[in-house]
Design a protein with these regions (language model features):
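Long, charged, low-complexity, helical-prone intrinsically disordered regions
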Residues: 1-137
Length: 137
């Protein structure tokens, strides 16, 4: 493990416009193991992944709209889903339009808050529970 020595940044932080850190890596790993995404290959750097129907349903249980067809930003060259290498965990977390929606949703629902003057994202206990409840279905 490399990266920040600050435990809060290791735990959860913003990477551009999406979640990174231990919690984000665990979420993406759990989603992959539950068949939410199909990764053709995951090289050392970022790569596109495909959101599968079961993943669309899981995101809906979380309250996240996974429809990319009506979103003008999503219809740009930006991928809908992308695996982004987490530099502190050396494993992938979720990026792209869906990754950004996940971060926005967590903040809007009050599951997490941005730490002042930091990239750290602090999850409340109920927020972390809610984030993983969709996998219990």
């Amino acid at each position: 493990v490399t990266g920040p020595s600050d435990p809060a940044l290791r735990r959860s932080r913003v990477c551009y416009d999406h979640l990174a850190g231990e919690l984000a890596v665990r979420f993406f790993s759990t989603a992959m193991s539950h068949g939410w995404f199909d990764a053709q290959h995951l090289p050392d750097e970022s790569t596109s992944v495909r959101l599968l129907p079961i993943g669309r349903e899981g995101l809906a249980r979380l309250g996240i709209d996974a429809d990319l067809t009506a979103d003008p930003v999503a219809n740009t060259r930006r991928p809908g889903c992308r695996a982004c290498m987490d530099w502190s965990e050396r494993r992938h977390h979720l990026a792209g339009t869906i990754g950004a929606r996940l971060l926005t949703h967590c903040l809007q629902r009050g599951w997490a808050v941005r730490a002042p003057d930091s990239r750290a994202v602090v999850f409340r206990k109920r927020g972390e529970r809610a984030l993983f409840e969709a996998f219990a279905e």
